[in-house]
Amino acid sequence: MRQLLGTLSLLGLLQCFPAVVSAQTQPASAAPSDPIEQVIAAKLMTAYPDGQFRSEQFISRAELASILVKTFKLDKRASAAKQEVISVQDVPSSHWAYNDIQTVLKTGIMKGYRGDMFFPNQKINRAEALSIFAQAHGVFQFPNDTVAKILAKYPDSGNIPDWAKKSMATALYEGFANTDEQGNINPLNPMTRGDMAYALSKFLERQEAPAPLLEEDLPSPASLPIQ
């Protein structure tokens, strides 16, 4: 009887071992894999007070300015320390994004309109937003044939304005731009919060694993559908 009890006790202990090993091999914490979760965790974007992210809502120019300042620490750049205030008629000092708008203007990352207008509430299309994002990140000085090779991978790249092609090539090369199921960039569509979350999540990933700067390693289009 004593031998039987000992055997049963040993079997019970052995059954516990896999659970213990499994618990020990689980990572203490895992980085969020969803783009929205990533950018919220990084405090680059926030959900609304009701807890919704509203990924299909359009990004405004003021929101883009605020996101860029936080992401690329534009306020730490030497040009942001200029003492003179840039006159912007439609952005009073009481505006929630006043400081960020001053920063993107002083650093030259974003431009005003008609001299002294910013249009902070105006939505911005994907070509503009991704090009500006690439400017803040740093545009690769690809030769024209490399730019053409990158853009040729996307069926609707002909819709990208000429002024944005080099910046868009950087954004696409770095994987910042999501595409629809056909691989289209949709450069003239409004930039959404979901699009921006995707770009930011890829930027965060690039901090850990930079893209190879080799022409033969040009990436395929990102396959995440556009929000």
Report residues per predicted region.
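Feature responds to low-complexity, polar/acidic, surface-exposed segments characteristic
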Residues: 2-33, 46-62, 69-98, 107, ...
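Intrinsically disordered, low-complexity, charge-dense segments enriched in Lys/Arg
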Residues: 169-171
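C-terminal/domain-terminus segments
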Residues: 192-199
